[in-house]
């Protein structure tokens, strides 16, 4: 996602979550047709964006996302575990993944989310 990703992460009191993220500088398609775009534009859009949602549960310093819908279909029905840490003021949430294959390489992702609401 680069150094300046853009996205939203939402957890509800009812136990649902949704996360979406991509680079902040995603190129626009040549057309405004949502289902249009060249094969190259579509491939780049898919390769640079993550979106999934479902249920979540917290156990100690681990949050488990039970994926019910996802842009990446292989995640549907899986559990995505992330270690988390909250800043002292509760405004920053850091999520750390186990090793994941991204772009053909195995990586550990560390995402820092900033709270935007009260």
Task: Kindly give the residue locations of the regions a language model identified.
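Lipid interaction determinants
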Residues: 1-51, 58-118
């Amino acid at each position: 996602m680069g150094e300046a990703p853009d996205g939203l992460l939402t957890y509800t009191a009812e136990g649902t979550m949704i996360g979406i993220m991509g680079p902040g500088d995603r190129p626009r398609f040549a057309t405004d047709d949502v289902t249009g775009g060249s094969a190259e534009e579509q491939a780049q859009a898919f390769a640079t964006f993550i979106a999934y949602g479902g249920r979540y549960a917290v156990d100690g310093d681990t949050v488990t996302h039970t994926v019910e819908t996802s842009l990446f279909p292989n995640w549907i029905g899986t559990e995505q575990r992330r270690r988390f840490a909250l800043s002292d003021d509760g405004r920053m949430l850091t999520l750390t993944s186990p090793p994941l294959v991204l772009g053909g390489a195995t990586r550990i992702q560390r995402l820092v989310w900033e709270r935007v609401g009260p």
